[in-house]
């Protein structure tokens, strides 16, 4: 009895210590990268305009227009992308469903051969395939997972993807505009807040990539800062030329 309890305790400890990150990033990845995209693009846009020595009102309007246009563009693109992917998956599932209905024996043999190729004994592979093929819906799910790498019960929603992308982009793009909306009369507070936001986004990305937070933060700060520097230089150049 003591041995069984000890083995159970060791198994429980192993399970607690043997956890893996979600390599797909879950909701965090698209949210962080959407916000980062909004922050970098709107910061670069506003910095470029500021480099042209325009009025404060022009910079604010540019930032708000960039936020709105970018967020809607991201949402539309994400909706189209996810909807197209979902339609493709549904089409593949329809093909598999039709094959299971018309040629059940062939599909069962296919599944058995798949398990055999993974090292399962032939007799056991055939028995497992036979048992799994008794329920048509279960058979469809198994074939989708094993042959197509698809989870029929976990298809992404285009609407959720679009709304998430819109919100994340808008949130990131709002950072360089926010100081102006709160009464700032120069571009420096907006730039400072945006740079802090860049470092913060990079630090959060470290949760997905498993890199050190300071390295990820500094890398994103450097990339965003470089984009802002280039657009500022271009804005200054063209502003001087036009002026």
Where are these regions (language model features)?
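Cytosol/matrix-facing amphipathic helices and coiled-coil assembly/linker segments
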Residues: 2-30, 82-165
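Internal alpha-helical transmembrane segments
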Residues: 2-81
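The feature identifies polytopic integral membrane transport proteins across all domains of life
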Residues: 23-34, 56-64, 124, 158-163, ...
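Transmembrane alpha-helical segments and their cytosolic interface motifs
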Residues: 27-46, 152-178
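Structural signature of hydrophobic alpha-helical transmembrane segments
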Residues: 184-196
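Interfacial loop-to-transmembrane junctions
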Residues: 200-227
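Juxtamembrane boundary at the C-terminal end of a transmembrane helix
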Residues: 232-243
């Amino acid at each position: 009895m003591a041995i069984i309890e000890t083995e159970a305790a060791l198994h429980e400890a192993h399970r607690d210590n043997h956890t893996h990150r979600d390599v797909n990033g879950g909701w965090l990845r698209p949210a962080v990268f959407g916000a980062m995209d909004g922050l970098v693009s709107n910061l670069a846009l506003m910095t470029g305009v500021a480099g042209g020595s325009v009025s404060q009102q022009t910079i604010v309007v540019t930032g708000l227009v960039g936020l709105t246009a970018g967020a809607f563009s991201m949402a539309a693109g994400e909706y189209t992308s996810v909807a197209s992917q979902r339609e493709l998956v549904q089409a593949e599932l329809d093909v598999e469903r039709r094959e299971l209905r018309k040629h059940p024996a062939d599909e069962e043999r296919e599944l058995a051969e798949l398990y055999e190729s993974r090292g399962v004994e032939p007799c056991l592979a055939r028995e497992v395939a036979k048992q799994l093929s008794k329920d048509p819906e279960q058979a469809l799910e198994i074939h989708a997972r094993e042959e197509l790498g698809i989870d029929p019960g976990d298809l992404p929603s285009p609407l959720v993807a679009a709304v998430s992308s819109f919100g994340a982009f808008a949130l990131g793009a709002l950072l360089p505009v926010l100081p102006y909306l709160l009464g700032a009369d120069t571009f420096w507070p907006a730039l400072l807040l945006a740079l802090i936001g860049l470092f913060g986004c990079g630090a959060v990305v470290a949760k997905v990539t498993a890199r050190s937070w300071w390295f990820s933060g500094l890398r994103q700060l450097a990339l965003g800062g470089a984009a802002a520097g280039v657009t500022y230089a271009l804005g200054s150049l063209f502003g001087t030329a036009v002026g």
